[in-house]
UniProtKB/Swiss-Prot annotation:
This is Large ribosomal subunit protein uL18. CDD domains: Ribosomal_L18_L5e. Part of the 50S ribosomal subunit; part of the 5S rRNA/L5/L18/L25 subcomplex. Contacts the 5S and 23S rRNAs. Belongs to the universal ribosomal protein uL18 family. One of its GO terms (biological process) is translation. InterPro entries: Ribosomal_uL18_bac-type (IPR004389), Ribosomal_uL18_bac/euk (IPR005484). It holds the Pfam family Ribosomal_L18p. One of its GO terms (molecular function) is 5S rRNA binding. Keywords: Ribonucleoprotein, Ribosomal protein, RNA-binding, rRNA-binding. The lineage of its organism: Bacteria, Pseudomonadati, Pseudomonadota, Betaproteobacteria, Nitrosomonadales. This is one of the proteins that bind and probably mediate the attachment of the 5S RNA into the large ribosomal subunit, where it forms part of the central protuberance. It comes from Nitrosomonas europaea (strain ATCC 19718 / CIP 103999 / KCTC 2705 / NBRC 14298).
Amino acid sequence: MLLNTKQMRLRRAKATRIKIGNSRQFRLSVHKSNNHIYAQILDPSSNRVIVSASTVEAEVKKQYPSGGTIEAAKYVGHLVAKKSIESQIYEVAFDRSGFKYHGRIKALADAARSAGMKF
C-alpha cells in the first residue's frame, strides 16, 4: 500500500491523538505550512481553544515577516508558553499533528519548554 506524504502524516497524527486522547491533559497542538506555524492549547473535555499563537499575528509578523523560519517558530513557542502561563496552564501534552519532531516543530517545543511549560 503506497501512501503519499500527507497521508503518512495524517496516519501518524491519528496514532498520536489516540495516545493523548486517553490522558485528561491540556493539549498543545502544532500545525505548520511552508509559510507559517500555528500553536494552540486545547481543553481536553471540550476541545475548545484556550490559548493560541501563530506567525500570522501582527505582533509576530512585525519581527518575522517570513513566518516559515526556525526563529519565528521559537518566538511562537515562547509566545504560546507565556499566554498559557497567564491562563494558569503549566503542563500540556504535545501534539505535533503527525509532523516529525525536527526543525521548526522542535524549535517551537524547545522554546515553550524554556519559557516554563512542561510536557
